[in-house]
């Protein structure tokens, strides 16, 4: 799922700085379906690799950048992700016991069925995004390394218009 998610990153040349006073980094081609697929993959990865950190380093950390990207500043998900991840890493390096042995620690179930279910959902979502992207590339005869792929979608247009 992670490799598929990596391969479906597109629209690099469409990144621009918003014209408002915040000067956010806007990536219009990084739309909701890719963000959800990324979130599912990243949660599955954290849950499978460091399960006892998955509540904070997985769910809470992903929600903290996805909610603003959907409801506050569309198109700025990558910037939100970089900020929240940096803050989280600084905090856990300064207070590592918070996620391991404090009263706020959340232990994962370590249940094989749960691990496989989360992974299967992440894989299915990323396969769906990859198939849709292939469809868009073939239909529009686009180069995913050079072109923005989703310029005909309303979500893309609204992100671009709101920030240019």
Residues covered by each model-derived region:
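Generic multipass alpha-helical transmembrane bundles of integral membrane proteins
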Residues: 1-76
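C-terminal transmembrane-bundle signature of multipass membrane proteins
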Residues: 57-163
